[in-house]
A protein has these predicted regions:
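Short, hydrophobic alpha-helical segments
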Residues: 55, 120-128
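Catalytic, metal-anchored helix/loop core of enzyme active sites in primary metabolism
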Residues: 99-114, 124-125
Length: 168
């Protein structure tokens, strides 16, 4: 909403050194024009093409969601490249970093914490060891700690396709 009211391009960097799941989810939710991720070899040519397409469609206010571990560089390098290619665009940079972990929990956050806490205690009573309780596909599961530490959430390419459609 702020981008629309001020006719600006916002580059928003979120956590995601190794995986772009947060950036992809946030990009989808916000209707971001582009989502720049560590898993994808995003290029400046693609980014600039998205911006040119937005200009051609008279879309003057946009958001570009950036995961911190992307291949284009840090958010300030990306902003500099955009400013060089599009000097008339007012580019603003926001780095959320660990700020995004803060804030008051939502109802869903509280329910999830209660359910996972219940299952953690249930697991202890049942003799589960070296596991954590978590949700996968709306089901509570026990995941080995080793897996929780070493595995990453895989991006759903369909999510990126939907995000691209909604951005136009």
């Amino acid at each position: 909403d702020t981008a629309s009211s001020h006719n600006r391009l916002f580059l928003v960097e979120v956590m995601g050194r190794d995986t772009g799941y947060i950036a992809a989810s946030t990009g989808l939710a916000t209707g971001a024009l582009s989502i720049i991720l560590p898993e994808k070899n995003n290029t400046y040519e693609e980014l600039f093409a998205d911006l040119r397409s937005a200009q051609a469609n008279k879309k003057t206010s946009n958001i570009i969601m950036v995961a911190e571990g992307n291949h284009l560089g840090d958010i300030f390098e990306i902003a500099s490249a955009v400013r060089s290619e599009f000097p008339s665009i007012d580019v603003k940079v926001t780095t959320l970093g660990h700020t995004q972990r803060g804030g008051s929990p939502s109802t869903n956050d509280r329910i999830l914490a209660s359910v996972l806490g219940h299952y953690a205690i249930k697991g202890l009573i049942e003799g589960q060891e070296k596991v954590m309780s978590g949700m996968i596909n709306q089901k509570v599961v026990f995941t080995p700690l080793e897996d929780a530490i070493t595995k990453t959430t895989e991006l759903d390419d369909e999510m990126l396709t939907i995000a691209k459609i909604l951005a136009t």
